[in-house]
Curated annotation (Swiss-Prot):
Belongs to the fluoride channel Fluc/FEX (TC 1.A.43) family. InterPro entries: FluC. It comes from Methanococcus maripaludis (strain DSM 14266 / JCM 13030 / NBRC 101832 / S2 / LL). Its main location: membrane. The gene is fluC. This is Fluoride-specific ion channel FluC. Na(+) binds at residues 72, 75. HAMAP family: FluC. Keywords: Cell membrane, Ion channel, Ion transport, Membrane, Metal-binding, Sodium, Transmembrane, Transmembrane helix, Transport. It is a multi-pass membrane protein. The chain crosses the membrane at residues 4-24, 36-56, 65-85, 100-120.
Amino acid sequence: MREILLIGLGGFFGAILRYLVSGIIPVKFGIPTGTLIVNLLGSFIIGFLIYSSLFGSLSTEYRLFIITGFCGALTTFSTFSYESFTMLEHNYYLKTGLNILLNVFGCLGMVYLGRLASMFFW
């Protein structure tokens, strides 16, 4: 039961941050920038914490709270997919491709940067 509460509490804060970021950051160049930012941020945090746990200790409770709960609610593949599909429906092919490339490769890059940052941290 404790694990579920930790995930739920982390998810509560991650969902609120996602809502705030998506509401504050406007669409730029026809790309849903808020979704991109939360996906990049969440990917960096996950990369940093996963690789930090290789060099230091990260308790199961922190992993559940931050990685599963917070980052799980912060990042959103379903919203990214819906926004990309909607862009395709409106025939924004170039912007859709750019959105997909930025999200996929940007998030992969952020996991890598998080990994590098964790090496310097520990």
